[in-house]
């Protein structure tokens, strides 16, 4: 049944703020939900199948509620609300983006971009060991680094330790030319990149020089006790079972450990079992440990990334066998 419905808003400016004053976003809503959208002054008219109009109204209601909660609605927020309604997910945009992490007085706070990201931040706040598992680009490492920097600034910990297995070199770094820093920097570059987005350059250099922030390969954690520290293990799918056990048993008093990885991207030799796969199974019922799983819905990179990954997955999936 075709229906026409008009929604009234407090002012033209308030309405325009719901779609970031970008008419392309309204076109995106039309294409996604199969409705016609007309807006003028402080109202918006929705035309189409009644079920589709219902969904379009839900999108505007979500956005208006978020606006009233103080959310600055931009392209990401609009598309997030649209996708949540399209997929019939019961998520509150305002609650999701109200989760903010302050890492520097000179830089804007880091904001959760999805319900899973919000759950991840809350899990890190409440638990001493957290596993963040899911595809690249979903914010696992970025949010963990933000939480670590925030904890350091609040003096909740005395240092940050960022580590990942240098699986590309089999962790046998000794044969590479240069000093230790020159050998390991290429493998740890993503962690440095995250830090640079959250700290001023001189602040980051000073913290690394004083070893308040330490970035090192996983092999260099052996034999240590990591007390009063926020430890992040990145690319954990490429740890062996022995390495994962080693790291988790290094955690000392007043420490947190966040382990991130993508179990679909394991680069270990075929005869080696991933340490994170074993840990997820062995530790699932241990109090004080939480696991948050991310999906393609949580992508925070360029919106084309989702389409690229989907296209590759479809291309690489085996073709069905012909019937005999």
Locate predicted features.
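Conserved helicase motor core of SF1/SF2 NTP-dependent helicases
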Residues: 105-115, 122-233, 237-324
